[in-house]
Curated annotation (Swiss-Prot):
Any one GO CC term of the record: nucleus
Native organism taxonomy: Eukaryota, Amoebozoa, Evosea, Eumycetozoa, Dictyostelia
Source organism of this protein record: Dictyostelium discoideum (Social amoeba)
Name of the protein: Ubiquitin-conjugating enzyme E2 S
Gene: ube2s
A single MF term (Gene Ontology): ATP binding
Broadest EC class assigned to this enzyme: transferase
Protein keywords: ATP-binding, Cell cycle, Cell division, Nucleotide-binding, Transferase, Ubl conjugation pathway
Region described as Disordered: 159-215
Biased composition (Low complexity): 161-190
Protein EC: 2.3.2.23
One Pfam short name: UQ_con
Pathway(s) this gene product operates in, as recorded in its UniProt entry: Protein modification; protein ubiquitination
Task of the protein: Catalyzes the covalent attachment of ubiquitin to other proteins. Acts as an essential factor of the anaphase promoting complex/cyclosome (APC/C), a cell cycle-regulated ubiquitin ligase that controls progression through mitosis. Acts by specifically elongating polyubiquitin chains initiated by the E2 enzyme ubch10 on APC/C substrates, enhancing the degradation of APC/C substrates by the proteasome and promoting mitotic exit.
Length: 215
């Protein structure tokens, strides 16, 4: 959807929020602004330390509807992730974007909520039954699967030119090499909530060390 479909006051609000996000520092979140279409917002969420997503770079997308902010934006991960609240197509299920949505909630709040979802998954709002089951029944196995997905799909840092090609990603202009997250789950405690991606990067491609079994 083009930003032309948004009312002028909403466009002004979104532009202001995007400028504030660009000028501020959100730990673990990097905005990838698109000047051509402010209704298509992308950001990279860095996997939080102490979680099975640590060391990963996950591109997320927010799509603003024509009646935003009366209706919440649609959110999805472009980067593949093994998470109970994220479907295999990348759709994100979080209460902030559903029953808890209010018009005064801003883009910053939404992005922080998505990051927090990587820290405290909610097994009850499940979009991935396999991930939800492992989270509840065998947290160590859940961590192993999540870390494997992270090492395969999210181990390389992301900078996007903000076109609409989901596969058009490059590594950032730094010499730091992405590392594969450790598979040691002993130090990670279960955060289950119940009831309730200057120089070009190296040309060496990271290949997964083992194949992913079909869940």
């Amino acid at each position: 959807m083009s930003s032309e479909n948004l009312p002028p006051d909403v466009i002004k609000r979104v532009v202001k929020e995007l400028k504030e996000l660009n000028s501020s520092t959100l730990e673990g979140i990097t905005l990838l602004p698109c000047e051509e279409d402010i209704t298509n917002i992308e950001a990279v969420v860095t996997g939080p330390a102490g979680t099975p997503y640590e060391g990963g770079y996950f591109k997320a997308r927010l799509i603003l509807s024509s009646d935003f902010p009366r209706s919440p934006p649609k959110a999805n991960f472009i980067t593949k992730i093994f998470h109970p609240n994220v479907s295999k197509k990348g759709e994100i299920c979080v209460n902030t974007l559903k029953k808890d949505w209010t018009e005064d909630l801003g883009l910053k709040h939404i992005l922080l909520t998505i990051k927090c979802l990587l820290i405290v998954p909610n097994a009850e709002s499940s979009l991935n039954e396999d991930a939800s089951r492992l989270l509840l029944e065998n947290y160590d196995d859940y961590c192993k699967h999540a870390k494997l997905f992270t090492s395969i799909h999210a181990s390389k840092p992301i900078i996007d030119s903000n076109n609409n090609n989901e596969n058009s990603t490059t590594t950032p202009t730094t010499t730091t090499t992405a590392t594969t997250p450790s598979t040691n789950t002993a130090s990670i405690s279960s955060p289950v909530k119940k009831k309730t991606e200057t120089t070009n990067s190296t040309t060496t491609k990271v290949q997964p060390k083992k194949s992913l079994k079909r869940l």
